[in-house]
Amino acid sequence: MINCVNESTLSWCNDKGENMTLTHQISRRLALALVASASLFSSVSIAAADKIKVAAIYTLPVEQQWISRIHKALNSAADRGDIEYTFSENVANTDYERVMREYAEQGQQLIVGEVFGLERAARKVAKDYQDTAFLMGSSFGGVGPNFSVFDNWIHEPSYLSGMIAGAMTKSNKIGMVGGYAIPEVNRLMHAFMDGARDVNPDVKFMVNFIDSWYDPPKAKESAFAMMDAGADIMYAERFGVSDAAVERGIKAIGNVIDTSGDYPGTILASALWHMEATIDKAISNVVSGNFEASDYGQYSFMAYGGGSLVMDESLVPADVASSVKAKQQEILDGLFRVNVNDARPQSDG
């Protein structure tokens, strides 16, 4: 029960989040006395309602590109005073379930993380702590009553970045280096390939996965091999690819974060992920008592501000930039839908 009061009436929210009002007039002193008494039996104080406790569990450092987007959004919420935020990073899959339970036992109201490598164990924890809200990056759906899922559905800006690459390649060969061939990665790569092919039917792709989320030397080595085979633009799904592009003097397309400042003159464009819309919706649902099992993936769409394209117009020709902006508007207006393909992408030829 969340209590609130003004001078003439007593209002409160019941456990279902419904607004309740005492209809007869009462004195300020009586109102305050009633609130003080009710607060003894209330599980959530006014202060706690304004600032909920949120914990995040990351399997990689918070600097890693995908993780950094979640961490940034949660820090923004903390800076606004909406949440008390704590986190654990570099948590091994073997320790993940234990850390989830520890945070739940501590009374964290919302636990955020990514459970691609331990789907079954994570759902078991959520079932054991049904008063805790869980929001997890996952390849599968949510499960009631309290386990929701999300992912970086930035296939739309990925398609747009593919248009740029397809229009600008001179060799008609584009290299693509990914981490793991999982649906979350595959759909972005396919969207990029579709965008490139739609403006350049002759383009061919070389695709490789390094089977790691963070191995820049291995990604760099794979990129060099593709460049040696004629690729003149690289899709940098993982760190290390853009470093190779800089060394060889070719262009690259970024993913999830904007690294153009780190690689000036190299990054043509990047498909960016903004986790704020997802996090803010989850926080709002927890505060209102409306959090339930659902898929928050839609909040990564461009229409919700969860995805965007950034391009370096000093590197991208004006006519190409104009075409991309027009297609972006079609997406935002609901006139063009980017295809979603979760299958493992393959090299051409």
Where are the regions a protein language model picked out?
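An alpha-beta-alpha
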Residues: 74, 160-203, 207, 295-316
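N-terminal export leaders
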Residues: 27-32
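Hinge/cleft segment of the Venus flytrap/periplasmic-binding protein
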Residues: 287-349
